[in-house]
Amino acid sequence: NRETAINIGLARSGGTMRTENWNRLPMIRMTNISIAPGTWRYDDLIADTDDAVLMETNRSWSIDDRRYQFQFSTEIGWEIKGGKKIRMLKNPSYSGITTEFWNSCDAICNADHWTLWGTPNCGKGQPMQTMGTGHGASPARFRNHHTAAAFPRPAADQ
């Protein structure tokens, strides 16, 4: 916000202090951040991936107050083996340390698959204030992170 921007060396505010209503105090809110499209074609990204889980449709999230550790769950995922989607997974999740996660991104799909995603219920404060946020991205690949699904792999696959 305008009051704290100078403390972190910024010449101007990022415009992140907002309020839900005229009768609430403004609070510093999450910035709407998007990832610029990369150069990968979606099919080429899948074909170039040997062993992974492609996750779709965000379901829930949790991040600590310092924004250091996080966990996200999705409604659906696809197991990828040898560059092919081989089966659907229910409620997959991923977790990690924020800086390690972002530094592990090695591929981002092109603008053909870029979408502006949003959440209508980012809440904070007392009394609670709820605001919508938006983040745009294309499918991307992140290496070496903990993933899990609601159902374990059958013993024959392990």
Regions found by a protein language model. Name each.
Residues 1-158:
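N-terminal small-residue-enriched
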